[in-house]
Amino acid sequence: MESDNRKTTDGLNLETIALQVCDIAREAGAYIKKERASFSVEKVERKHAHDYVSYVDKGSEQLIVKALRRLLPEAGFITEEGTAKGDDVGCLKDEEGCTWVVDPLDGTTNFIHGFAPYAVSIALIRGREILVGVVYEICADECFYAWKGGGAFLDGRCKMEDGRCKMSDGRCQMEDGGCKPSFRGVPLHVGQSTINDALLCLQLPYNSDAYKPVIKQLIQHFYGNVGSIRMIGSAAMALCYVAAGRLDAYAERYIGQWDYMAGALIVMEAGGRVTNYDGEEFFMQGDSVVATNGTVHDDLMKGLETARQALER
């Protein structure tokens, strides 16, 4: 009998779904990687000032939506590029139904410039619950995934080369003389740095002049008081890096649900904390996210509040 943390009340096997979504994300990633080899910036469209979309975003989304419809035919969609016409309601589905939240290429600007990281992000939600989160980083071939109550993991698939598994450190489970087709990958856990040593990621939104004064105040507040500050250009990957202990904290405002939904679950299942900019635990319908290792969360929130107060003087 399977443990409770692998199922929801309606019988969904979340672990199985997570691994199936990993395969779908990898398939989309392979398409993106292939298209990048012959990509031309002349094929890029502007959605807003400094916010871009390409035929690769749309092609990846179509591939993902088609595969997810086969996996859970009754589920709805929230997609960045809106290719799931007829199902894409642009908001959370009702409390009973499941909804896929898809970013087919998070970090499009990075992709355009051939600058890592960029990723595929897929989440399954129901009401106020994030059930499954999968983020596949294409350049490093890393798949981060989690399911509610089951933990967060990295690379739960064997990597074959010349008929042999590249995972030579004993992590791979063998079955009938070969690699077992699926298994839980490396468990993820957030880091333990305090604010003085923290590696902090502060993303800048593309299209919001209102946020410019805030980010200036934030950098002024934290610069010299944390280990270092970074900007990586992908919300999904910033969240995964927090989950893996590569970053200690990440904050961004004016972003879409598809940007953060999968990564947020991965952080929480890795032992981290996620809120919105107001410190509220229910962040799923908002446009801001703050994710940390937990240790530095209050310090980061104080910095956000200090920045706001400075602008009100």
What would you call each of these model-derived segments?
Residues 32, 57, 68, 108, ...:
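Residue-level signal for inorganic ion chemistry
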Residues 90, 94-153:
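DPxDG-like acidic metal-binding loop motif
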Residues 133, 152-155, 183, 202, ...:
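Short hydrophobic/aromatic-rich beta-strand segments that constitute the beta-sheet cores
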Residues 1-105, 310-313:
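N-terminal subdomain of lithium-sensitive/metallo-dependent phosphomonoesterases centered on the IMPase/IPPase/PAP
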Residues 58, 62, 81, 104-107, ...:
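Generic detector of well-ordered alpha-helical packing
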Residues 152-154, 181-183, 209, 296-299:
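Short helix-loop capping/hinge motifs at secondary-structure junctions, enriched
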Residues 3, 9, 157-178:
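Arg/Gly-rich low-complexity intrinsically disordered repeat tracts
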